[in-house]
Design a protein with these regions (language model features):
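Nucleic acid-machinery interaction/catalytic patches
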Residues: 1
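Soluble catalytic regions of membrane-associated enzymes that act on cell-envelope
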Residues: 211-294
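Membrane-embedded alpha-helical bundles of multi-pass enzymes
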Residues: 7-215, 265
Length: 294
C-alpha cells in the first residue's frame, strides 16, 4: 500500500517540503548530475500528492513545481534580459509565469492521483508519464526537464537505449514510488512489504545492469558516411542583429563550400540562419547549384 496521511502535519511544513523537494530536483540534471536527487525530489512530490486533503496537495504540488521550474528554466533570463532587451524584473516575471503554466501538469498528476485514490507505483508512473507527454505536446510543448535525462549516469542507464527518455522517466517515477514505499514500510516495520519492494528494485537493477552490457548497435560493413557539423560560433548579441545577417550567411556559406563534395552530410545548427527562408533564397539557390556540380 502506498499511502501517507498528513492530517496531523502542519500545512506550512508540507508546503516547505514540497518547495525544497522541487528545488532539489534541478540538481539531478546537468551540469550538477546528482542523479540520485531525482528520487529525493520525486519522493517529496509523491509525499504531498497523497495528502488526504486535495486542496493542500494541489497547492503543495504547485509550490513543488515553482521550485523545480523557476530554477530549472532560469537560463531563460539570459535570453530574455541580456539578449531580448527586457528589464531584469520583466524577465523574472516572464520566467515565473512560464513556470506557473508548467506547474499545471504536475498539478494534473496530483489531481488524478487524488481522484482515483491511486496506490500502485506503476499507476503513479503512468499518470506522471502521461502528464509529461502533454507538457511536451500542448501548444507545441515544452519538454525540458524530464527526469529520464537525469539517469544516464545512474546504474539504470542500461535500459535507456530500449525505452528512451520517456521510458526512463516512467521508470524514475516508478522507482521513486517504490523507494518511498520501502522507506515507509521500514518505518512501520512492515517487513513483508520491505522485502517485496527491495526485491523489485533488485530485479529491475539487475536487468538494467545486464542490458547495459548489450551492444544494441552493430557496425554495418562497407563504406561509412562522412558527416560534417558546421558551427559559426557567432555571439548571441550579433546573431539576432539584422545588420549582421549577411555576415552570418557568409560564414556558413564558406564552411559549407569547404566540405561540399567531401562530406555525405553537412549539418548546421537549427537556428544557424536567423531569418525566413525567402529572405535568403539566392543563398540556397547558389548552394544547390554548386552541390549539383560536385
Amino acid at each position: 500500500m502506498f499511502f501517507c496521511s498528513m492530517d496531523k502535519m502542519n500545512k506550512l511544513v508540507v508546503y516547505l517540503i514540497a518547495l525544497i523537494s522541487g528545488v532539489i530536483g534541478v540538481f539531478a540534471f546537468s551540469p550538477f548530475d546528482y542523479w540520485g536527487l531525482a528520487y529525493v525530489s520525486l519522493g517529496g512530490l509523491l509525499f504531498v500528492a497523497k495528502n488526504a486533503q486535495k486542496s493542500t496537495a494541489l497547492l503543495a504540488t504547485f509550490l513543488w513545481s515553482m521550485g523545480f521550474f523557476c530554477f530549472g528554466v532560469s537560463w531563460l533570463n539570459v535570453s530574455i534580459h541580456q539578449f531580448g532587451g527586457a528589464s531584469l524584473g520583466v524577465s523574472y516575471l516572464l520566467v515565473g509565469l512560464l513556470s506557473a503554466y508548467l506547474a499545471l501538469y504536475p498539478m494534473l498528476f496530483t489531481y488524478l492521483v487524488q481522484c482515483f485514490k491511486v496506490q500502485s507505483a506503476v499507476i503513479f508512473a503512468a499518470i506522471w508519464t502521461l502528464t509529461e507527454f502533454l507538457r511536451g505536446w500542448v501548444f507545441t510543448g515544452f519538454p525540458w526537464l524530464q527526469f529520464g535525462y537525469t539517469q544516464i549516469d545512474s546504474p539504470f542507464y542500461g535500459i535507456a537505449p530500449i525505452f528512451g527518455v520517456t521510458g526512463m522517466t516512467f521508470f524514475t517515477v516508478w522507482a521513486s514510488a517504490v523507494i518511498f514505499n520501502l522507506v515507509f514500510s521500514l518505518s512501520k516495520k512492515q517487513w513483508n512489504l520491505v522485502g517485496v519492494n527491495a526485491l523489485l528494485l533488485l530485479v529491475v537493477g539487475g536487468l538494467s545492469a545486464y542490458a547495459g552490457k548489450v551492444n544494441f548497435v552493430q557496425p554495418k560493413e562497407g563504406k561509412g558516411l562522412t558527416i560534417t557539423l558546421a558551427q559559426g560560433n557567432i555571439e548571441q548579441n550579433l546573431k539576432w542583429d539584422p545588420e549582421y545577417l549577411y555576415a552570418t550567411v557568409d560564414i556558413y556559406q564558406k564552411q559549407i563550400l569547404a566540405h561540399l563534395g567531401k562530406s555525405d552530410l553537412i549539418i548546421l545548427p537549427e537556428s544557424a540562419l536567423p531569418t525566413l527562408e525567402n529572405a535568403i533564397t539566392p543563398f540556397f539557390e547558389a548552394l544547390d547549384k554548386v552541390a549539383k556540380e560536385k
